[in-house]
A protein has these predicted regions:
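Structured segments of extracytoplasmic/periplasmic soluble domains
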Residues: 59-63, 91-103, 142, 173
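Alpha-helical assembly-interface signal, strongest on the long, hydrophobic N-terminal helix that forms
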Residues: 2-94, 201
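Surface-exposed patches in mature extracellular/periplasmic domains of secreted proteins
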Residues: 67-72, 101-113
Length: 366
């Protein structure tokens, strides 16, 4: 009998210990569940704030691109955004005002959380505030004590945590032109990436488009995406460009390949001269981007070539730049002299490397 009561006592003792352990485990599980639910809600809210910050930064930077579209390179270089700062910030605020995050609508973004500046991927840090020729906008969207109030917790308040701060940042910038629409490349020549890599400063530097194949003429003639890549076909394209019967194809950096002729284009020189004579007097802002009837300013592609030798292959286009053809000298020199210009804006998407020409349609960079 004594052993029986002793056994019952031990069982009751074990039950008590088990109850304590179960109670502790339930508390721990409840804690994990509480934090899991609240962390999940916080992440959903952060995603919503991120979308708001992204949209606000893109909208404001796009307005910056629109402003630049009406300017010459010299005006872009001297542009001070102070006069447009209120407009740029209001555009970002309007995007947020039409959005909600964490169940709250009409999100407010403070002036201090919208910063106009410059983005340079090679710099550290890459974004710096400035109103002098800016190319980027940085936006912070908040649910905290500074703006819109923190989000409320569900179960974490059991542990004394009643609210949580959530923020999201985004930077949108005008970057190197990444696309050229149909007809946007009226000159069937490109510049090797080697020309840019070999120069500490390439802005306003001279380059020859004829003859090519050396450091001074680090360029190549092409027939766009046509075949064959012959001087005869190049002549036909030059003639059709001059008469308005041909338009260059839509070109996307990193995707499109052009067929380069290899430098044997002497028979096409007179056709090059004829195209120059037609284009230099257009001054239409499209085919000829200047107002000087003695020069021809146009966008040309940059092709992926390791040196300045004459290219003879289907070669990927990796970006775009703007050139001014200043003179085409006939016999006896047979020379086409040009220079690369910087601080140009094209109504096109960015996303490409920087070769002196930006796209006015921004992208998210951070």
């Amino acid at each position: 009998m004594r052993n029986h009561f002793l056994t019952l006592y031990k069982l009751r003792d074990r039950d008590g210990v088990t109850a304590i352990v179960v109670g502790i485990m339930l508390a721990i599980l409840l804690g994990f569940a509480a934090f899991a639910i609240d962390i999940g809600y916080s992440r959903v809210t952060k995603n919503e704030l991120q979308n708001i910050a992204d949209g606000a930064a893109l909208a404001s930077a796009r307005q910056l691109g629109v402003i630049y579209e009406t300017m010459s390179p010299s005006e872009i270089r001297s542009y001070d955004a102070s006069a447009d700062e209120v407009t740029l910030k209001d555009i970002a605020k309007d995007v947020a005002d039409q959005s909600k995050a964490g169940g709250k609508g009409n999100i407010i973004i403070n002036d201090d959380d919208i910063v106009i500046g410059s983005w340079d991927a090679s710099a550290s840090p890459p974004f710096s505030p400035t109103v002098s020729s800016p190319n980027a906008v940085q936006v912070t969207a908040r649910r905290d004590s500074i703006s819109n109030g923190p989000i409320s917790t569900f179960f974490a308040r059991i542990f004394g945590i009643n609210t949580s701060d959530v923020t999201a940042d985004a930077t949108a910038a005008l970057t190197g032109q990444g696309t050229a629409e149909e007809g946007g490349l009226p000159l069937p020549v490109g510049i090797s990436r080697a020309w840019f890599l070999n120069k500490e400063e390439f802005c306003d530097q001279p380059i020859k488009f004829y003859p090519t194949g050396d450091s001074e003429g680090c360029a190549g003639w092409n027939v766009y995406t046509e075949t064959p890549s012959s001087a005869s076909n190049l002549r036909d394209i030059l003639d059709d460009l001059a008469s308005g019967d041909y338009e260059s194809p839509e070109t996307i950096a990193g995707k499109t390949e052009f067929d380069f002729t290899g430098g044997n284009v002497a028979t096409a020189f007179s056709d090059m001269k004829a195209l120059f004579d037609v284009m230099k007097i257009k001054n239409d802002g499209i085919l000829d981007k200047d107002d000087d009837s003695n020069t021809w300013t146009a966008t040309v592609p940059v092709y992926d070539w390791a040196d300045c030798s004459n290219p003879n292959d289907d070669i990927p286009i990796i970006g775009f730049t703007t050139v001014v053809i200043e003179e085409v000298l006939e016999s006896p020199t047979h020379t086409i002299n040009a220079r690369v210009t910087c601080d140009n804006i094209e109504t096109a998407r960015g996303g490409g490397p920087s070769y002196g020409t930006w796209g006015s349609i921004p992208g998210l960079v951070e």
